[in-house]
Amino acid sequence: KKIFLTLILSFAILSCETTTSSADPDGRSLIDPTEMIEIATAFNNALNTGDIEMAASMLDEDAGWSFPNGVNVEGKEAVVALLENVNQIWTTIDQSSGEDTAYLGVTGGDEGEEWKALLSWGEATYANDSKSVTVPYHQVTWFTDDNLIGWISGLYDRTELVASYDDDPIK
């Protein structure tokens, strides 16, 4: 009986150990997202109040924005121009309008090429005097070593937004 009990306990203990093979093969790991959330929230607040200059101060010179229709806007100047244009259409641009926005901080990459990103899921609201559109919104925001926004990838259904435009500003 003692031998069987010893064997069972040994297997139970060994099966609880974390093996190196359970690590992410791409080297990604979760990190505390607090600082990235603060930056993303400040960026969102700047957009929501129409303070494009403040939003621009949080962007890296090589910043970019990817949209679900395949459009990539590259370079800080191009992103700022897009924000100015969209801000003419919407008086409210709130990319975390839902109280249930979920965040996840992730880091990874090879030595010397590390990256960190904030993943967020929630609702985005775009509104003006005549219309309000709220869509489920998924976003990945990459940050530079200087905690500037390096790139944003937004994933959402653009159908209602495009229907609101006379001319789609993101094409």
Identify the role of each PLM range:
Residues 150-171:
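Low-complexity, intrinsically disordered terminal/linker segments enriched in charged
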